Amino acid sequence: MRVEEFDYTLPEERIATYPPAERGSTRLIVLDRAADSITHSVYASLHERLRPGDLLVLNNSKVIRARLIANKPTGGRIELMLLEKHEGVQNLALYRGRLKVGDRLLAHGAELTVEALPDHGVARLSCDTANLTELFEAHGSVPIPPYLKRDAEEVDRERYQTVFAELPGSVAAPTASLNLTDELLEKIKAKGVDVVHITLHVGLGTFLPIRSETFEEHVMHREFYNIPESSAHKIGEAKARGGRVVAVGTTVTRALEHAAPRLLDSDFSQEVSGEADIFIYPGYEFRIIDALLTNFHAPRSTVLMLTAAFAGKELLRRAYQEALERDYRFLSYGDSMFIS
């Protein structure tokens, strides 16, 4: 299967560059796979799509301050976007500007060194005074996606974070749940839907396009995840009794499907941690999730391919066409899709 099959024209005016005026005031396109149907609704009606006994799974990872401006000794400005959070000596970062191996950058009293350039627009950096994560957390800003083509503003500090974000570590938000409000979550629970949290720290692959021509050539990025014991137990229990597991976002989907062998083991009742490197595309057989809430994704992206694997290529193609014709808003701050 070729990557070009997942290309489409996304007009720039269809990209939501700011969040909606009120959290949760977005639209929702609804795909029913069994009926091969598409209907149009609003995000605030999500609870009406759920059933008593469903299990809603959320990603509680919190976006860290991952964007930093550094300068070359000559004065040139370099924008850096941290791509992974760990306590090691070196970290990967996206960069805007011109860099070569050995270049030194200055940022808030620290000196950074370009140790390697492992991919287009990606640098491996070291820091002379502290670990890079601490430097970014102290002086960085919200890492809104590069395709928004603007600097982060005050509104992004609140709105590029979910209302239940808890554990710091992501360099991008789990965007499917950006429009979930406390009020909507209460309506969902009141309907008899159980809600559990997992953690997957969103990292490198969110910003890097697929450069290969075929799926087989693509090397998927790794993202750390943790499924607490209580959540793992409820997921396994839901599958055992035939209940629906509803994944809020592709990050939740990747974590659950990667952990499927342990979650489906009837003798297993512990937390699950790992590094999800699973590449989900059409032909994949889902073992855990039964419904998916997600956003409209960029062309040729791995998350678009995951969505196509779950919805079916043709149904998803029709849904995207209808969404474009009806002026839906796309990408992180945009409208959403519910697939059952």
Swiss-Prot record:
Keywords: Cytoplasm, Queuosine biosynthesis, S-adenosyl-L-methionine, Transferase. Pathway: tRNA modification; tRNA-queuosine biosynthesis. Its EC number is 2.4.99.17. One of its GO terms (cellular component) is cytoplasm. GO terms for molecular function: S-adenosylmethionine:tRNA ribosyltransferase-isomerase activity. The keyword Cytoplasm applies. The keyword Iron does not apply. Pfam families: Queuosine_synth. It is an enzyme of class 2 (transferase). InterPro entries: QueA, QueA_dom1, QueA_dom2, QueA_sf. Disulfide bonds: none annotated. It catalyses: 7-aminomethyl-7-carbaguanosine(34) in tRNA + S-adenosyl-L-methionine = epoxyqueuosine(34) in tRNA + adenine + L-methionine + 2 H(+). GO terms for biological process: queuosine biosynthetic process; tRNA wobble guanine modification. It is found in: Cytoplasm. Belongs to the QueA family. Monomer. Transfers and isomerizes the ribose moiety from AdoMet to the 7-aminomethyl group of 7-deazaguanine (preQ1-tRNA) to give epoxyqueuosine (oQ-tRNA). This is S-adenosylmethionine:tRNA ribosyltransferase-isomerase. It comes from Chlorobaculum parvum (strain DSM 263 / NCIMB 8327) (Chlorobium vibrioforme subsp. thiosulfatophilum). The gene is queA.
